[in-house]
Amino acid sequence: MSNDLNFYINGEWVKSESNELIDVINPATEEVIGQVTAGTKEDIDKAVSAALEAFSTFQQTTKEQRIELLNNIISEYENRYDDFVQIITKEMGAPIWLSEAAQAKTGIKNIHETLDALKDYEFERPEGDYTLIKEPIGVIGMITPWNWPMNQITTKVSAALA
């Protein structure tokens, strides 16, 4: 059984303001496969505050730096691919073939597609007498469904980082 009881906020693992635990249940076996801590408004506020602080420097990153970041994420994803398949299988109660083909593979594909789009994207271009500059707008919040975890997370996170 896995217990992931801390949150990753501001570059470190921190305890929640809550002591409430939520069981993670494999819907195919109804076995409790782990626990996570129930987050609180205070936990969200800490995460948003850290994200806003980080954004002040992240918004200054170059296209090349963001390309490198996405390449690093792809490399780490590929290194942990089999782990993702196993975790998705347990969390969703899905057959391994489905976790691999429809979940883990879709996640890495999403990041690759975002990387390809980023490489070709024009953040600055002349428009008549002026120059149009597209820049990051700020911190985002994401809610993802349980039934497409890697697809939704990778789509949203990779686009936000690009």
Task: Please place each PLM-identified region on the residue numbering.
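Conserved small-residue-rich beta-alpha loop and adjacent elements
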Residues: 123-162
